[in-house]
Every structure is written in C-alpha cells, then in structure tokens.
Amino acid sequence: MLYACYDAVANEGKNAYNQFAPIAERFNGIISDLGLTLSLDDEYEVIIDNFRKKAGKDYAASRGEYLNGIILANYLGYEFVDAAKVVFFRPDGKFDDTLTDTCLASVLHGLSHAVIPGFYGANPDGTVRTFSRGGSDVTGSIVAKAINAELYENWTDVNGFLIADPRIVDEPKVIESITVSYTHLRAHETREDL
C-alpha cells in the first residue's frame, strides 16, 4: 500500500490525502483495536509531505515499520527510537557499523526499554535507506552488538505455532494458546527429541 501510494503521489501527481487515507485508516484501526489514545496525524502529514517531495521508495517502504514502531512503543510504554537516527550507511551504501555502534550505545544508554523499527537506517545525507536483505533481523543483531547484549534471539516470522512439523504431517493444526516459556523450551529442543 505504501509503495502504491508513493507512486501515485510522487510520480503520478494524484491527491496525497485520498491516496493515503486507506493507510491511515489501517493504522488508526490498529490503534483503536489496542485501546490506545495515540494520534499519528502529525506523522501522516510528514509522510505525505515527504511523498510529495519524492523522498524515495526506501522511505516509502520504511514507513510501515516506522508507524508500527511508534504504536508498539506506545502500547508497551517504552521509548521509541527511530532507526534513521541511530542506524547509518556510508556514502557507498554499505552499513556503517562504527558510527551506528557509537550512536546506538549513546542513545540507548540509560534506557531500560526501547522500540527501534527494523530494516532501515539513514544515508550520510539523512535520507532513509533500507537494508538490501535481512530487515528487522539485521537491525536486532546490530542493536544487540551495540549494547553488548549477552544474548540475541531472533524468532522467525510465522503465522502461528503448529502442533507438528508440516514437512512431516499434512495440515497440522495451529496451537490456540501458548506460553513464552514453553515456546522457548520447544525452540531449543534438538531434532532427535522430536
């Protein structure tokens, strides 16, 4: 939706508010479903303005993660840290680990919890750039390194937990309810245990 909106506004000159309305409706629905009083209207205005200024497809692609990060931080009561302010790329487009580590360590120092959207950062000129692959998984490992975390766990995106391996059992059912500790235990079992 964000790519299509960006193209319609930046390249086809269509009405930005009309094009962005379904996106705002989707995010406002999430906010409502979570029972939050958060308003993203100012963020929507900035995004629409940047679409008009042709901020680029990387910027457009990153805005869903950005808005979801704000919502999640609000829901959890954590600080929101925009990845474009703490994750950096060099002029050649490669990840700048030195600058990123320094900035992340400084910004996160003293914070007990923070939400940092994944899969994007900023070029030296401040424009948003997305990682070529790996996305949020990469960002998580970058943050873990910068804060000298003892452990970084990356749980792959799935549509739920199944009662059996779908490679072995046809159409296994989804587990309706599961605890984090049980999930953790199962994730670390060896193949022989299964």
PLM features per residue range, with description:
Residues 192-194:
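N-terminal low-complexity segments that are often proline-rich with Ser/Thr-Pro
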